């Protein structure tokens, strides 16, 4: 039992992996570099490493020295987990167990739970024997130690082998029942440092005690002595960030629902204007695919009268409607009209935005298609009639027929070449279908309920999903209050959606932090710690502000408002509650951008923790790998090549010139200096 435990390094990655091997979940070990700063978050305990004093060593490992702070009451000592270190090199495991087995909110796992239950009420010595007789602990301990060398260096007579190397020791600082205890396995009793103040945490008192101890050991020198090291046992950061991300994503969904509900009440014309334009786009597609080319003058006159009759009454200012986007690709040879004259072709957009319908207005798309149909592509061969019929059937399935009361909007084709026209049309229709199926396309400004997929049939509401709108507000890693600052250009989706909602080019870049960040100030501190609640009338508040004392599980916190928000939309329109008094659309957009920034920051922190855990495992494998086989093979190869003897002689001569001791050769010189026998001198003469 007293043999076989190896020394462990003071490394947070090693201790973290050792905790996992013990079977403990949700715990990791971090290194503390600054004793002057407060420790963020909850801390289960501290593990302090210091250089062991030579004078305190003896054959009996447990020191019998007592002072005023030692706790000698058996009832107090036996009720906490304090064990004597009866096995050499086991202080690292003792320090970890002293922290873990004295915490109530840690998932210990089967091994440590069994040890804690079995040793309840035992004396410190009996607990030390229990640790030594647990093979699971010894196996986990040695699995993270460096391989022990096979041949130890020769010992010098009269000097203990322990004194030839520096020895370090681990102790624990743990809060137990409102008091700070120092648990040292090489002392008979635990040390009570007393309670901490009411206006401070136990970590503050522990830092003061450790700084005083370092100051006494270093005689007042600065507190950066390399002979000391401090590590903290804390909750697993990965679980923390995963839980935070879960809450943030639920709150993002709630904010999107609030924005959707608010837009339905304050801007119903966006939804009302969608019906005629959707039916109109279907007729435009059919007319472009079936009608033969006619004269330009008749189409111009018909198109001009139709735009004067429909556009003024149907299209709200600054709103983007789905109908023109659909018709743009179905009129390959149309011309833009302005008082009967042909408009000049508009300047081209960048290549990565040129083919996206959310990056340009409907009129610009018509002008682009009128300027060049087969631009940058060769003319495809004529398509058979069956392809046109299939495309027509696809469009009929995706869009219903126009109601009888609507007037068809005729296309304006130029006289095309007789051969390649059907092929170009089929290709444009395929592009239309691809754009409609794109998950990031935003054709209207009114978002719908979350988790809704784009429907092939039109409805009275928007077909954009909440996730699509949320993707428009991805922001870099910044603080919530800085998320509205113009530090980078907004995406085309964000700019266009803002223009649809507010009639401005870049309102998110012009947000007034005092005016539009009211939602961020009120709800910002709660977006990452609690669930936001959306009431039936569109008001947002944290669950802590609700009058109900009981909180439903996380899965039901947001689902209930989601189910009740849609049926109450019509009722909210009738009552016309002043939604802007609570949060305006711009304030909700600012809050949404704040949530997106927090999500990005949490995802980056989670990735960092995952990478750190991978590095811990890589370092542990490098530490525990046995390099003896490689070294022996390399030396054997040198000997076979005849290079080993010359290398040894060369290095010995270099070390002699530099005055470096080489073990036994240096030890044999000392008695030679004291020899004064005359035969020896005569022999030298």
Curated annotation (Swiss-Prot):
Gene behind the chain: bap1
Site positions per UniProt: Important for enzyme activity: 184
Keyword annotations: Chromatin regulator, Cytoplasm, Hydrolase, Nucleus, Protease, Thiol protease, Ubl conjugation pathway
Protein name: Ubiquitin carboxyl-terminal hydrolase BAP1
Cited InterPro entries: Papain-like_cys_pep_sf, Peptidase_C12_UCH, Peptidase_C12_UCH_sf, UCH_C
Subunit: Component of the PR-DUB complex.
Record carries keyword DNA-binding: no
Known role: Deubiquitinating enzyme that plays a key role in chromatin by mediating deubiquitination of histone H2A. Catalytic component of the PR-DUB complex, a complex that specifically mediates deubiquitination of histone H2A monoubiquitinated at 'Lys-119' (H2AK119ub1).
Major site of localization recorded for this protein: cytoplasm
Catalytic reaction(s) noted: Thiol-dependent hydrolysis of ester, thioester, amide, peptide and isopeptide bonds formed by the C-terminal Gly of ubiquitin (a 76-residue protein attached to proteins as an intracellular targeting signal)
Site (Transition state stabilizer): 85
Residue stretches making up the UCH catalytic domain: 4-235
GO terms (BP aspect): chromatin organization; negative regulation of DNA-templated transcription; protein deubiquitination; protein K48-linked deubiquitination; regulation of cell cycle; regulation of cell growth; ubiquitin-dependent protein catabolic process
Matches recorded under Pfam families: Peptidase_C12 (PF01088), UCH_C (PF18031)
Region (Disordered): 273-325, 363-425, 440-493, 550-579, 659-685
Species, as recorded: Xenopus tropicalis
